[in-house]
């Protein structure tokens, strides 16, 4: 018997819905990206330190949330990260910290900038180093010229290091920007001069944070990670693939980096918290008061 037009339409609609559902399920099964904090911890088997809320935009003012909107959900995420790092430093002091990611545009520079601000706001003396000598971004985030910085300090070892450091405009936070891009960043970062710079910075501040290139893009992060007290791997929700995050982790492990944990960036589930207050007062300081040194007289970069 011939089907009525209405019944034929119903069958066609049902078949279309089933096909669409099958496609959605297939895409979900094929999706290898990290989407939740527990995904991140399961994929890497290292502590998940914080989930950072998605920001409202990509302008410098919107990205540096700890400066412009510190009480927002995103700002709360950086305070949680700060607190968890303080507890990580109980057994071993944390003076030098490296921030990296598996691939580009996953939030490592934004994370480094906001974590540096969060630590400075808690009374720490912090130096933020833009060690990404390939695609630096800290000068844009803080609205500073990039005509002087780490690359110049590496190429002019006889000049005092404070000549290359500038003020951030925030109490407790100084910046060593990337400076002009060199033709051989990996060689410069692997030099003895860089080792001396790391030691001098660590002696002059409570915490020194290094923003480095992605681990799977260049060897730069691996060169520095071996010298650091701790390393954090940033993953971007819905962008970072599990297999690539695992490859980045394996490379860091191979150079014996001290991995403190991972951070999930742009987490769209982080819209707020049941309690805005965390036990930061009970968290131990990253360094003892005796650690603090007489800071250099910093000259703003013109």
Language-model features: where?
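Membrane-interface helix-start motif
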Residues: 1-9
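Short boundary/hinge segments that flank catalytic cores
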Residues: 9-125, 131-151, 183-186, 192, ...
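Gly/Ser-rich helix-loop-strand patches that form or flank binding pockets
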Residues: 43-48, 226-233
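Phosphate-binding/switch loop-helix module in NTP-utilizing enzymes
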Residues: 85-88, 178-218, 225
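Residue-level preference for the first positions of well-ordered beta-strands
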Residues: 96-98, 125-127, 173-175, 207-209
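Nucleotide-state-sensitive switch-loop elements of NTP-binding domains
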Residues: 152-181
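Conserved Switch II/interswitch segment of TRAFAC-class P-loop GTPases
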Residues: 212-217, 228-246
């Amino acid at each position: 018997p011939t089907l009525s037009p209405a019944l034929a339409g119903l069958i066609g609609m049902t078949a279309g819905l089933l096909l669409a559902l099958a496609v959605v399920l297939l895409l979900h099964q094929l999706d290898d990206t990290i989407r939740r904090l527990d995904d991140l911890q399961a994929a890497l088997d290292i502590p998940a330190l914080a989930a950072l809320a998605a920001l409202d935009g990509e302008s410098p003012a919107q990205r540096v949330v700890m400066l412009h909107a510190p009480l927002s959900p995103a700002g709360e995420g950086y305070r949680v990260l700060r607190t968890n790092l303080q507890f990580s430093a109980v057994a071993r002091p944390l003076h030098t910290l490296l921030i990296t990611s598996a691939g580009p545009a996953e939030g490592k520079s934004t994370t480094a900038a906001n974590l540096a601000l969060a630590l400075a706001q808690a009374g720490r003396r912090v130096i933020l180093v833009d060690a990404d000598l390939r695609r630096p971004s800290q000068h844009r985030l803080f609205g500073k010229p990039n005509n002087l910085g780490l690359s110049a300090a590496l190429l002019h070892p006889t000049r005092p290091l404070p000549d290359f450091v500038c003020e951030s405009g925030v109490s407790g936070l100084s910046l060593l920007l990337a400076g002009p891009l060199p033709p051989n960043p990996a060689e410069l970062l692997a030099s003895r001069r860089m080792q001396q710079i790391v030691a001098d910075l660590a002696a002059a501040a409570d915490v020194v944070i290094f923003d480095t290139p992605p681990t799977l893009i260049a060897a730069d992060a691996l060169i520095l990670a071996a010298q650091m007290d701790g390393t954090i791997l940033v993953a971007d929700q819905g962008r970072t693939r599990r297999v690539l995050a695992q490859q980045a982790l394996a490379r860091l492990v191979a150079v014996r980096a001290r991995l403190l944990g991972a951070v999930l960036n742009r987490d769209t589930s982080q819209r707020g918290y049941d309690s805005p207050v965390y036990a930061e007062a009970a968290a131990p300081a990253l360094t003892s008061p005796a650690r603090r040194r007489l800071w250099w007289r910093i000259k703003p970069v013109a």
